Amino acid sequence: MNKLWIRLLLVIAILAGAVCIIMREPVKLGLDLKGGVYAVLEAAPEKEGDVIDNETMNSLIEVLDRRINGIGVAESVVQKAGNNRVIIELPGISDTTEAINMIGKTALLEFKIMDENGNLGPTLLTGGALKKAQVGYGNLGEPQINFEMKPEGAIEFARITRENVGKQLAIVLDGKVQTAPVIRTEIPGGTGSISGNYTVEEAKRTATLLNSGALPIKAEIVETRTVGASLGDE
């Protein structure tokens, strides 16, 4: 009889512990409960017929995950689908355009010398040299993006500015010149700013993109839709 009671008490204790653990775990509210944006991103090989390897796809997922975390989306889903697609779920997001702006941009930052005719030279430095980027404000209070480079990037940036005094240094994002100031003197320390008539929100979004890194491969959003909170309404 005593053994039976001991076993019964042991079972009750185990069940109570399991309930406590379950209650402590946060309930994940996906698209069914919160609604949001569902998107499918398709990676494209550089050359037709090339195969995209798992390492590249994993790198793509990591960058996308950092971007989404950077804008504070909780309970998001970023997962591989098939050989070259990524499914993205963003609960609580209602602005599809905003989501596309964050997900679909390559965010390739390049530093190039611009000649007097506006022609761009070869890429001298990329966003891979950045340590961090954050929103700042210029002399007139206009939003801009302040950046700091990694040690090796700072050394290269100093060399580039030293050897090109008097020339324009174009800062290019996804093929579009953001700003092209004239280099007045060598810039040591690896710090600088990017101005481009940004709103505060645009500056924040761009800083997040730069901090998360450029997509490792060209990718295109092939499907996107807003999903209602179907279960939450029941």
Feature locations, PLM:
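A structural signal for conserved, well-ordered secondary-structure elements
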Residues: 1-234
